[in-house]
Amino acid sequence: MSVLSESIKQRIREHFDRYPSKQAVTLPALHMVQEELRCVPAGAIEEIAELLELSPAQVYDTMSFYGFFRDEDKPLGKRRVWICRSLPCMLRGGDELLAEVCDRLHITPGGNAKNDQVTIELAECLGACEMAPCMLIEDEVHPAIDADHVLQVAEGKS
C-alpha cells in the first residue's frame, strides 16, 4: 500500500521541470510529505526515492541532515511553533518564555503537547530581532509577547 497520496506524488513530479535534476527535488519533496503527513515515514522515503530515481539511503541522508524533518516515531503536532533562541531574543526574555510555555504544555523543546496540537521547537535565529522575543508558527513570524499569547497563537485562537 502506498504511503503517499497520488496528489502529493503529482506535486513532487511538478517540481521536476523547475530543477536541474530529479535529485535536486529531494528537499522540496521531503517538505511536501512532512507538510501533509506531519512526518516522513520510512515508506515515504522509499516512494520519494523511486520517484526521484535515487536510493532510499540518499533520500534518508538528506532528511537526517536537516533537524526539522520528523520520522513516524516522532510526528509533528498540528501546529509547529519555533521559539527563537538567538541572543537578542534571549536578552528580552526568550529563555523565560520558552520555559513557561514548555511548563504549561508539559513538554520539552522538540516535543508535542499531550493533545498533539502543538510541537515546540528551538530556532537559532528567525531574523526578526525587532520583535524579540519572537516565534515562527508554520511559515509566519509572530512577536512572542508572553506565554499566554504564544499558546493562543499556537492553538489557532488568535
Give, region by region, the residue ranges found by the protein language model.
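Signature of N-terminal electron-transfer/Fe-S-associated modules in redox systems
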Residues: 1-158
